[in-house]
Amino acid sequence: MPPKFDPNEIKVVYLRCTGGEVGATSALAPKIGPLGLSPKKVGDDIAKATGDWKGLRITVKLTIQNRQAQIEVVPSASALIIKALKEPPRDRKKQKNIKHSGNITFDEIVNIARQMRHRSLARELSGTIKEILGTAQSVGCNVDNRHPHDIIDDINNGVVECPAS
């Protein structure tokens, strides 16, 4: 027999899903079925919570306590950059591996770095800013109409000042 269900126990489940869509509930079922939750209801809740992130792959953190699920969106750096580009959502099924040829400001990069600061491995904010610039390079966008790696070189040479915190 399984152990008795403890109503105060908190379980945390991380899921990758596409924003604004109800993922296949068959994928949710093995993860949250044993915790006494309905996969269909949780799928609808996730779709509602990720409405702002339409068409982007994001991580969702489910905190489950007493058969209630709290949903928290944990966006990746690339998802934040693509959202900052303000591109219209594209059809995932038609286009794969899209290069985003937009342009964002250095201030937006700094804001994204501040949001990602707690998850970064860098010691200072300037290191986190360089991480985000590297991600911007991978996404394929420009920063202040320049290639992101040129800005990284400028930060290393002291030409561009990074905020302290």
Swiss-Prot record:
Record PTM Phosphoserine, positions in chain: S38, S165
Localization in the cell: Cytoplasm
Top-rank taxon, per record: Eukaryota
GO molecular function, one term: structural constituent of ribosome
Entries under SUPFAM superfamilies matching the protein: Ribosomal L11/L12e N-terminal domain, Ribosomal protein L11, C-terminal domain
Primary location recorded for the protein, binned into one broad class: cytoplasm
Cross-link (Glycyl lysine isopeptide (Lys-Gly) (interchain with G-Cter in ubiquitin)): K48, K83
Keyword entries, A-Z: Acetylation, Cytoplasm, Isopeptide bond, Phosphoprotein, Ribonucleoprotein, Ribosomal protein, RNA-binding, Ubl conjugation
The keyword Nucleotide-binding is annotated on this UniProt entry: no
Mod. after translation: Ubiquitinated at Lys-48 and Lys-83 by RNF14 and RNF25 in response to ribosome collisions (ribosome stalling).
Modified residues (N6-acetyllysine): K54
Cross-link (Glycyl lysine isopeptide (Lys-Gly) (interchain with G-Cter in SUMO2)): K40
GO biological process: translation
Keyword RNA-binding set for record: yes
GO cellular component terms, A-Z: cytosolic large ribosomal subunit
InterPro entries named in the record: Ribosomal_uL11, Ribosomal_uL11_C, Ribosomal_uL11_C_sf, Ribosomal_uL11_CS, Ribosomal_uL11_N, Ribosomal_uL11_N_sf
Record family assignment: Belongs to the universal ribosomal protein uL11 family.
Primary role: Component of the large ribosomal subunit. The ribosome is a large ribonucleoprotein complex responsible for the synthesis of proteins in the cell. Binds directly to 26S ribosomal RNA.
PANTHER family in alphabetical order: 60S RIBOSOMAL PROTEIN L12, LARGE RIBOSOMAL SUBUNIT PROTEIN UL11
Protein name as annotated: Large ribosomal subunit protein uL11
Name of the gene: RPL12
